Curated annotation (Swiss-Prot):
Annotated family: Belongs to the UPF0178 family.
Protein name: UPF0178 protein MXAN_5526
Highest taxon listed in the record's lineage: Bacteria
Xref: InterPro entries: UPF0178 (IPR003791)
Length: 153
């Protein structure tokens, strides 16, 4: 099992929570970005710097992630690729993408993108709050605990 982090737009507090959790459960954590990352030198932590370009990090994660892995991303199209592969996907606010909700989330995302492209101002997400951090930490802990228990020995 690995934790895959779409690090290009990962909030700092989320990165810190992931680092601590990965060390606690001794799971290899891979941060993927199209720029150099400054990460602490820790056991179980690595980074992959992919080439520049749209969705290059996403494609790397989609190709490398395996069933039973966990991924953290706010990129809904990436989540839509990972969930059917059996990868547990969390967003930075602690929402778990599932077979039941990922198609709807992708449809809403595409609709909002069409609105923006046609000139409609749609606004952005709320700022990242302490409550978001708590929800993410709780969801990450629950999913990691479940995955570690079900991982073949």
């Amino acid at each position: 099992m690995k934790i895959w982090v779409d690090a290009d737009a990962c909030p700092g507090p989320v990165r810190d929570i992931i680092l601590r959790a990965g060390q606690r459960v001794k799971v290899h954590t891979v941060f993927v970005a199209n720029h150099a990352l400054s990460l602490p030198r820790l056991a179980y932590v690595s980074s992959v710097q992919v080439g520049a370009g749209l969705d290059v990090a996403d494609r790397h994660i989609a190709q490398q992630a395996q069933p039973g892995d966990l991924a953290v991303t706010q990129d809904i199209p990436l989540a839509a690729l990972l969930v059917p592969k059996g990868v547990v996907v969390l967003d930075p606010r602690g929402e778990v993408f599932t077979e039941e909700n990922v198609a709807e989330r992708l449809s809403v995302r595409n609709f909002m993108q069409e609105l923006r492209e046609s000139g409609v101002t749609t606004g952005g997400p709320d700022g990242y709050s302490a409550q978001d951090r708590q929800q993410f930490a709780g969801a990450l802990d629950r999913e990691l605990t479940r995955l570690v228990k079900t991982e073949p020995k």
